[in-house]
Amino acid sequence: MVKLAKAGKTHGEAKKMAPPPKEVEEDSEDEEMSEDEDDSSGEEEVVIPQKKGKKATTTPAKKVVVSQTKKAAVPTPAKKAAVTPGKKAVATPAKKNITPAKVIPTPGKKGAAQAKALVPTPGKKGAATPAKGAKNGKNAKKEDSDEDEDEEDEDDSDEDEDDEEEDEFEPPIVKGVKPAKAAPAAPASEDEEDDEDEDDEEDDDEEEEDDSEEEVMEITTAKGKKTPAKVVPMKAKSVAEEEDDEEEDEDDEDEDDEEEDDEDDDEEEEEEEPVKAAPGKRKKEMTKQKEAPEAKKQKVEGSEPTTPFNLFIGNLNPNKSVNELKFAISELFAKNDLAVVDVRTGTNRKFGYVDFESAEDLEKALELTGLKVFGNEIKLEKPKGRDSKKVRAARTLLAKNLSFNITEDELKEVFEDAMEIRLVSQDGKSKGIAYIEFKSEADAEKNLEEKQGAEIDGRSVSLYYTGEKGQRQERTGKTSTWSGESKTLVLSNLSYSATKETLEEVFEKATFIKVPQNPHGKPKGYAFIEFASFEDAKEALNSCNKMEIEGRTIRLELQGSNSRSQPSKTLFVKGLSEDTTEETLKESFEGSVRARIVTDRETGSSKGFGFVDFNSEEDAKAAKEAMEDGEIDGNKVTLDWAKPKGEGGFGGRGGGRGGFGGRGGGRGGRGGFGGRGRGGFGGRGGFRGGRGGGGDFKPQGKKTKFE
């Protein structure tokens, strides 16, 4: 290796000085002076190669690393020349540029000052020179392949011409790997043919430099965009390979490695766009994944039940086909005298639904749970889907004002055709509310009309629709038939001595009369009178209202809030606590003249409702608005208009009970300032506010302390 370096010394010096100053040929004999000139020429030539700078961006990669490593060990310029000649190694300009090219990597390894100065220029010419290096060397075949590669690169570079001027330093890293192929063989051929071909090559160099500049610049820019980071390690690897100039196989391996690196770089460039598009693809994939389970759900739930009487059947054998399962399930129920309308199975065939003709068949079918179908014990239960809830709500009634001691059996005696009764309780105590489910919607409507106001355990029950009907009922205030026109009158202030026969004489067109009684068989002071049509009920209301029966003036109202749609001087208050007194009731409506609570004659206990009289309809209206949705003694009361029994007093003062410091407590009460009662100072309740109202305004809500 040392001998080769010496031989390359003399020859390399002559080559370096040859191109610009032809004095190199004359001074080739003196080696020491050429070394000095090489150093000086390297500095001067830095300016010259800048024009060709973009050409060699890629080539110097391997050469640069090798030159530096050898520079540190052997300062002679001979080795610099030996490694650098890529393709144009023989050409003198190539050698001149080679010396600076070696300095390119120096910023990391050697002096930083030289590296900065030479970075743009050296690498650029190094790439251009290799083009001729292979012609004089033994690797003529390699030169041809390199030229082909350059042509291919030129084609690729045409696409990237717009980006030529970007990143001058990055390009050398990628392309510098290829020209090194001919590097080891080039110096050997130069020793034999340099003297003969130098003149010719110099001329050729000058002619081709102009053309090669454009070609190389295009090539380097095309690959210069690629990330240099991956190619850098390959340079270090090439250093070890280039030290052994006699092994051509290693050069071939370098070529393969370089091609792989180039491919990797190309892939990186191509991957930049997909990375941006990836989120979109991922979103599509995510939506597809999300849509999949929904599609399954639709397949399972897609078929609507043919009847409202359906059961869920689980633990089916999924190894059987749909037809086999349907046939087996139908046969099972047919053997038990149950007619099946339809059988629907899920997509996984592990469960399904069975539709029956009637509620009786459904109840009988529930008893068959645990029987085997294709070796599996089936599970039968009522479905809990949204559709079944709507169906059940349509045929279910809500019963209110029930006795707290009422039982399901007692309700069953009243609602004989009820399919299910559910009492609502809290902390083990009944809330006086129950849900009564019937077999059909028609049965529910029939019971609402017939049993509305029925006395159960000493209390008059109030019935309401549930579900969508119940919501409409609340908006319209109708508690009677679904048509909204009540055929029933509610008679209040009835004498306790009055009987059903007495009322039949007064209301001749009545089709049904009910006089509720207490457990002791005594009348409660009110009655329900049903007529054949709404017109008959309305006629009786107009003709018999305020009629005196057995010493008392009766009050008639159409059942439901429609009967009390017109304001009067009297409010009907329902939902009172058993502990509420007339004094408390009157104080709750401060503008009231009088208040009375309906009590049982025998026991003297409250019936849960009462009446409050005012001096005028305006005062009553203001009080009603103030106490709407209000509470009295912890019970939420319901207000409605009633026909006054007597004349009022001296006028009301507005807001309801409560307010700051009132029964409503610190939160404003029901009638105070800002309270739910909407009464009080400036409230809808009117004049001066409720008992607790009108005081200092305290903002509602949580307090925030700042330390």
Curated annotation (Swiss-Prot):
Skewed-composition ranges (Gly residues): 647-696
Annotated keywords: Acetylation, Cytoplasm, DNA-binding, Isopeptide bond, Methylation, Nucleus, Phosphoprotein, Repeat, RNA-binding, Ubl conjugation
Modified residues (N6-acetyllysine): 9, 15-16, 96, 102, 109, 116, 124, 320, 350, 379, 400, 429, 446, 469, 478, 514, 522, 569, 574, 643
Low complexity: bias regions: 56-92, 121-137, 179-188
Chief localization: nucleus
Modified residues (Phosphoserine): 28, 34, 40-41, 67, 145, 157, 189, 212, 303, 358, 403, 460, 462, 577, 588, 616
UniProt cross-references to SMART domains, sorted A to Z: RRM
Any GO CC annotation of this UniProt entry: ribonucleoprotein complex
Sites of Omega-N-methylarginine modification: R691
Tissues expressing the protein: Expressed in B-cells that have been induced to switch to various Ig isotypes.
Pfam families in the record: RRM_1
Stretches with biased composition (Acidic residues): 24-46, 145-170, 189-217, 241-273
Transmembrane in keyword set: no
Region (8 X 8 AA tandem repeats of X-T-P-X-K-K-X-X): 58-135
Post-translational modification summary for this protein: Some glutamate residues are glycylated by TTLL8. This modification occurs exclusively on glutamate residues and results in a glycine chain on the gamma-carboxyl group. Symmetrically methylated by PRMT5.
Sequence repeat ranges per the UniProt record: 58-65, 75-82, 83-90, 91-98, 99-104, 105-112, 120-127, 128-135
Phosphothreonine PTM sites in chain numbering: T69, T76, T84, T92, T99, T106, T121, T220, T369, T407
Every RRM domain range: 309-385, 395-468, 487-561, 569-644
Region spans: Disordered: 1-308, 639-707
GO biological process: angiogenesis; cellular response to epidermal growth factor stimulus; cellular response to leukemia inhibitory factor; negative regulation of insulin receptor signaling pathway; negative regulation of translation; positive regulation of transcription by RNA polymerase II; positive regulation of transcription of nucleolar large rRNA by RNA polymerase I
Record-listed cross-link Glycyl lysine isopeptide (Lys-Gly) (interchain with G-Cter in SUMO2), residues: K299, K326, K372, K379, K514, K574, K586, K621
Subcellular location: Nucleus, Nucleolus; Cytoplasm
Function: Nucleolin is the major nucleolar protein of growing eukaryotic cells. It is found associated with intranucleolar chromatin and pre-ribosomal particles. It induces chromatin decondensation by binding to histone H1. It is thought to play a role in pre-rRNA transcription and ribosome assembly. May play a role in the process of transcriptional elongation. Binds RNA oligonucleotides with 5'-UUAGGG-3' repeats more tightly than the telomeric single-stranded DNA 5'-TTAGGG-3' repeats.
Protein name as it appears in the record: Nucleolin
Organism: Mus musculus (Mouse)
